UniProtKB/Swiss-Prot annotation:
Protein's recorded name: Protein FAM163A
Expression (tissue specificity): Highly expressed in neuroblastoma compared to other tissues, suggesting that it may be used as a marker for metastasis in bone marrow.
Single GO cellular component term: membrane
Family statement drawn from the similarity comment of this UniProt entry: Belongs to the FAM163 family.
Transmembrane segments: 6-26
InterPro entries referenced in this protein's UniProt entry, alphabetically: FAM163, FAM163A
Keywords linked to the UniProt accession: Membrane, Transmembrane, Transmembrane helix
Keyword Transmembrane helix (UniProt): yes
Membrane topology listed for this record: Single-pass membrane protein
Cell location: Membrane
Keyword Membrane attributed: yes
Length: 167
């Protein structure tokens, strides 16, 4: 490979990686804005739901569960034939069958994750430490043992060329 081919291949690879990152970020933002409801939208939807559809006693539904489309006659009909079996919503537990909350790319808000999104600090101390810190180690005094060779150092190695080599 020539240097130009390597540069072009690296540029294409970097472009593909950046496009993948941008696509994942756009998907996350899309999921965030599609499932987020403001207070006025919730009130308007509740009024419409009272007039049009029966309410579910299980709790609020997510956008994936309550989404509607035009049917052949021009009226709104729910996209799913059966409602969620679990309550949906940002603060409540979510149904995994019809909502994108189970996606690994979904951005969870602070009220959806344990520990409040990291706002509360948790301390950790091992149970074997006492309040004074780690226990002191009691070591025996080192002993010296005489090192003896059965002969001189030259006798232990029979081939002197195997020990040192030219560089």
């Amino acid at each position: 490979m020539t240097a130009g081919t390597v540069v072009i291949t690296g540029g294409i690879l970097a472009t593909v990686i950046l496009l993948c990152i941008i696509a994942v970020l756009c998907y996350c933002r899309l999921q965030y804005y599609c499932c987020k409801k403001s207070g006025t939208e919730v009130a308007d939807e509740e009024e419409e739901r009272e007039h049009d559809l029966p309410t579910h006693p299980r709790g609020p539904t997510c956008n994936a569960c309550s989404s509607q489309a035009l049917d052949g006659r021009g009226s709104l009909a729910p996209l799913t034939s059966e409602p969620c079996s679990q309550p949906c919503g940002v603060a409540a537990s979510h149904c995994t069958t019809c909502s994108p909350y189970s996606s690994p790319f979904y951005i969870r808000t602070a009220d959806m994750v344990p520990n409040g999104g990291g706002g509360e600090r948790l301390s950790f101390a091992p149970t074997y430490y006492k309040e004074g810190g780690p226990p002191s180690l009691k070591l025996a005094a080192p002993q010296s043992y005489p090192v003896t060779w059965p002969g001189s150092g030259r006798e232990a190695f029979t081939n002197p060329r195997a020990i040192s080599t030219d560089v």
